[in-house]
Structures are given as structure tokens and as C-alpha cells.
């Protein structure tokens, strides 16, 4: 980090069914007080605090995967999914790995894009993380990814399109530039995203902007309380939550709904 500071993180492994979930924790001995607080909240931090969270998540996340591969013998990921711009720096870390092994910038960028996908969740520009270009330069000039030219990193997130702010570094823009494929999280959201990011594809009609959509979904039995399912069975005689006519929900009295609490 700048000013000869270091940021270390402990890796916690949680088992989600058969899927290992790796979590990064900066509250460890050896970090200064500011660094220990980087992972103290999910949202709400601003300025350098938020930037350091996203550097840790993206670049530190790739490093954590490499440690996990080495310790467990797990295969290396074949595809990296950047779920919103928060983890966008994972692409920079992967480019650094390739450049450290002799690739040039363009070759490393192409290789990284080839197996990276990006999902945007945000339907309004105000919801996207943006930093001053000077902040990004300050951190990367300190040697975060020594083999990667800082100007190349800055160009990835530059709002270099009509209506953009040349002084800002946009995490979603970087995510899109580092990905082979991109999607929104609903059909309408895909349309909104194509409009919102159309400046990245000058000369394309909005309908041709290469952002598709994958509709969010949930595993219904996991997310619906058994008491709600039982109420549906009692009121409508349905065998499972999949036998549904949502319009009949209006037949349930307010009292029955309050009693579920």
C-alpha cells in the first residue's frame, strides 16, 4: 500500500453445502489500525476505505484462490465471474500474474478477457462505485501490480465516452472492459444496462450493445418459510409451492398473515 504500508488478510473457509466459500478478514495482527478496519463493514465506507475494500476483494481474492489451490490441490478456476464492479480488480491481478510470466500487456489483457464474465446489478449510475483517478494512481504507483503500467489500469476504468467524467475511475466500466461477456439480472435490467453503458460501444445501436440478461432467481423451498408453505396448503390445497396461483394470495386475510409472525 502507499507510504510503505502492508495489508494482510486471513482467509476463512466456510462450507456452504459442498461448496467452499472463502472469506477475507483484515482484522489480523500485523496490520495497522486503519488496515484492520478495512473489512469491518459491508457497505458504508467511502473514499480510500471503500477503494481498499475493493482492492482486497479483487486482487486479494485471486491471491486467496491461489493459496487455496496450493493447500488443497483444487483445480484452478477456468472462468472468473465478476459479480458487480466491487471485485473488478481481480482482472488486474490476473493480468499481473500473466505479465510476471512474460506476457505483454495486450496479450495478457486478451487472455484475461477470454475467461471473465461480468454481471451488473445496478440500474442507475449513482449506484456504481467511482473513484478519483488520482486515488487509483496513488495506490497503483505504490507497486500494487508492479508489472502492470498504472496508465493501463487507469484506462480500464476511464469514463472516456460522451457524458463521462474524465477525472473518474468507474468500477463497472472496468468490469465491462475486462470481460468477454456481460449481463444484467432481468430482461428489463438488461435493456436499461445497454442504454446506460452504450457509450462504451460507439457506433453500435443500443439494441446491439453486448450486454444480455440472466434473470435472478432463488431456490423456493430454501427461501419460503415452512409456515408460509403450510398456510398455502391449508388455504388452497396445493401439494407443493410449485402448484401456485399467485392471484389467490389476495384471498388470505390480514389476520392470517399477521399470525405467521
Language model features with spans:
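Catalytic cores of carbohydrate-active enzymes across secretory and cytosolic contexts
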Residues: 1-261
Amino acid at each position: 500500500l502507499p507510504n510503505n504500508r502492508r495489508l494482510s488478510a486471513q482467509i476463512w473457509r466456510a462450507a456452504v453445502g459442498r461448496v467452499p466459500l472463502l472469506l477475507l478478514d483484515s482484522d489480523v495482527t500485523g496490520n495497522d489500525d486503519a488496515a484492520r478496519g478495512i473489512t469491518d463493514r459491508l457497505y458504508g465506507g467511502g473514499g480510500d476505505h471503500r477503494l481498499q475494500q475493493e482492492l482486497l476483494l479483487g486482487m486479494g481474492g485471486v491471491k486467496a484462490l491461489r493459496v487455496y489451490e496450493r493447500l488443497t490441490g483444487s483445480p484452478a478456476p477456468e472462468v472468473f465471474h465478476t459479480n458487480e464492479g466491487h471485485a473488478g480488480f481481480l482482472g488486474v491481478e490476473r493480468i499481473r500474474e500473466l505479465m510476471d510470466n512474460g506476457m505483454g500487456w495486450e496479450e495478457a489483457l486478451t487472455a484475461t478477457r477470454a475467461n471473465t464474465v461480468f454481471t451488473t446489478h445496478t440500474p442507475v449510475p449513482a449506484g456504481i462505485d467511482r473513484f478519483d483517478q488520482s486515488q487509483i494512481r496513488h495506490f497503483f504507483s505504490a507497486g500494487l501490480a508492479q508489472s502492470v503500467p498504472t496508465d493501463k489500469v487507469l484506462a480500464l476504468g476511464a469514463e472516456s465516452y460522451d457524458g463521462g467524467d474524465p477525472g473518474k475511475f468507474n468500477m463497472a466500466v472496468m468490469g465491462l472492459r475486462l470481460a468477454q461477456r456481460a449481463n444484467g439480472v432481468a430482461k428489463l435490467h438488461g435493456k436499461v444496462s445497454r442504454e446506460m453503458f452504450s457509450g462504451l460501444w460507439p457506433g453500435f445501436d443500443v439494441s446491439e450493445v453486448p450486454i444480455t440478461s440472466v434473470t435472478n432467481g432463488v431456490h423456493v423451498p430454501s427461501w419460503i418459510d415452512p409456515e408460509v408453505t403450510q398456510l398455502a396448503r391449508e388455504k388452497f390445497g396445493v401439494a407443493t409451492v410449485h402448484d401456485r396461483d399467485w392471484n389467490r394470495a389476495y384471498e388470505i386475510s390480514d389476520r392470517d398473515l399477521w399470525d405467521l409472525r
